[in-house]
């Protein structure tokens, strides 16, 4: 008799994806973040669903409804803070996941990589529209400033902005449509994540050595299910520490003030996970140039498979490229810091240098380092 998981149509899909999946025997803890992202997504959808039951997407009551959730709903404060900090956790895992992909050359699986970039764009869009929903000062002005960037698009820009707003300014209709988008996008992300997995399982995972491991693969269960479970427990411990002890650490105090179109906050800035892109946007004096740089700062990831010049896939044995990789990480940290600072000297010049360095490392230095390392291998 055939085992049910190998014969039942639905169980077979689960079996091929999570139980009998052939997996490289040497993948490290850095490969845990894919499953942790799945956990974050489930967590966000569940907490978001319960928040949506009590939230009202109307400009007059949105702020009050969030207050009502925190004060009057059973464990509403916990659900709200889990959802708000869950977004930060999501992006931490996302950035580590992308970093691991760059370090170990996972971008050579182009279909999986490109769907991943699309997932990143969708996650950023979801987080942006979600940040508008509490209708605090930073929500309102963040929505105004970021959507206004689209007016830089020649010819159709202004019409496009007014079409997104549903009027001549960010108002009731904007909030309603942002709520609708924030509700539907996570389900689109879930569907795309499944396609992401589908393409990954066509090729199999890469490994730290960057060499084929077909001859020594092991089944996913029990080896990596236990490893993923450990990662999930550690992540949840870290997450609950953040939620229960430092719930407002990553938020903006301005968002505890109800939105007021007549009073502009002294310094408008997005959530911390967008600050690096915001710094790149601000470092270019031209509005259209800034918007192009902002989009390209994420889209540049799609060029990685074509900029790979080395004969080795992974950076494990490439000290020159390793140095550049960590320089890129340091540069992103500097950009994140600059994005949260006011537009004044010396921050302006630091932001401009860091932005130039960001694109230079990816587009010029890393491909050059690959070629130099190829030469060194011949010696």
Swiss-Prot record:
InterPro entries: Cyt_b/b6_C, Cyt_b/b6_C_sf, Cyt_b/b6_N, Cytb/b6-like_sf, Cytochrome_b, Cytochrome_b_C_euk/bac, Cytochrome_b_N_euk/bac, Di-haem_cyt_TM. GO terms for cellular component: mitochondrial inner membrane; respiratory chain complex III. GO terms for biological process: mitochondrial electron transport, ubiquinol to cytochrome c. It is a multi-pass membrane protein. It is found in: Mitochondrion inner membrane. Heme b b566 binds at residues 97, 196. The chain crosses the membrane at residues 33-53, 77-98, 113-133, 178-198, 226-246, 288-308, 320-340, 347-367. Keywords: Electron transport, Heme, Iron, Membrane, Metal-binding, Mitochondrion, Mitochondrion inner membrane, Respiratory chain, Transmembrane, Transmembrane helix, Transport, Ubiquinone. Heme b b562 binds at residues 83, 182. Its cofactor is heme b. GO terms for molecular function: metal ion binding; ubiquinol-cytochrome-c reductase activity. It holds the Pfam family Cytochrome_B. Coiled coil: none annotated. Component of the ubiquinol-cytochrome c reductase complex (complex III or cytochrome b-c1 complex) that is part of the mitochondrial respiratory chain. The b-c1 complex mediates electron transfer from ubiquinol to cytochrome c. Contributes to the generation of a proton gradient across the mitochondrial membrane that is then used for ATP synthesis. The cytochrome bc1 complex contains 11 subunits: 3 respiratory subunits (MT-CYB, CYC1 and UQCRFS1), 2 core proteins (UQCRC1 and UQCRC2) and 6 low-molecular weight proteins (UQCRH/QCR6, UQCRB/QCR7, UQCRQ/QCR8, UQCR10/QCR9, UQCR11/QCR10 and a cleavage product of UQCRFS1). This cytochrome bc1 complex then forms a dimer. Belongs to the cytochrome b family. This is Cytochrome b.
């Amino acid at each position: 008799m055939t085992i049910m998981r190998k014969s039942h149509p639905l169980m077979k899909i689960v079996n091929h994806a999570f139980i009998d999946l052939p997996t490289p025997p040497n993948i490290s803890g850095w490969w845990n973040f894919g499953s942790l992202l799945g956990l974050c997504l489930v967590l966000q959808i569940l907490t978001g669903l319960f928040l949506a039951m009590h939230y009202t997407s109307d400009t007059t009551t949105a702020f009050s409804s969030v207050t009502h959730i925190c004060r009057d709903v059973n464990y509403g404060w916990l659900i709200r803070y889990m959802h708000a900090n869950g977004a930060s956790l999501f992006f931490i895992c996302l950035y580590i996941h992308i970093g691991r992909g760059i370090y170990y050359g996972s971008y050579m699986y182009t279909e999986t990589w490109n769907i991943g970039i699309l997932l990143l764009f969708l996650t950023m869009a979801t987080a942006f529209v979600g940040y508008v929903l509490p209708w605090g000062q930073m929500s309102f002005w963040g929505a105004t400033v970021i959507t206004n960037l689209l007016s830089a698009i020649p010819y159709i820009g202004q019409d496009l902005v007014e079409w997104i707003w549903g009027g001549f300014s960010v108002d009731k209709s904007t909030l309603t449509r942002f709520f609708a988008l924030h509700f539907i996008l996570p389900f689109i992300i879930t569907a795309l994540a499944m396609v992401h997995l589908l393409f990954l399982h066509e090729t199999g995972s890469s490994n730290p050595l960057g060499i084929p491991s077909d001859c020594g693969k092991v089944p996913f269960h029990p080896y990596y299910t236990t490893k993923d479970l450990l990662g999930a427990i550690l992540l949840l411990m870290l997450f609950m520490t953040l939620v229960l002890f430092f719930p407002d650490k990553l938020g903006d105090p301005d968002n505890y003030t109800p939105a007021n179109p007549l009073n502009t906050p002294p310094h408008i800035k997005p959530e911390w996970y967008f600050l690096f892109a915001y710094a790149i946007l601000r470092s270019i004096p031209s509005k259209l140039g800034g918007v192009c740089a902002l989009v390209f700062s994420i889209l540049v990831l799609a060029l990685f498979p074509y900029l790979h010049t080395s004969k080795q896939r992974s950076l494990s044995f490439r000290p020159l490229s390793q140095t550049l990789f960590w320089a890129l990480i340091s540069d992103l940290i500097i950009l994140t810091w600059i994005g949260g600072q006011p537009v004044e000297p010396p921050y302006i010049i630091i932001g401009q240098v860091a932005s130039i360095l960001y694109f230079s490392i990816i587009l010029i230095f890393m491909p050059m380092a690959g070629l130099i390392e190829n030469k060194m291998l011949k010696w």
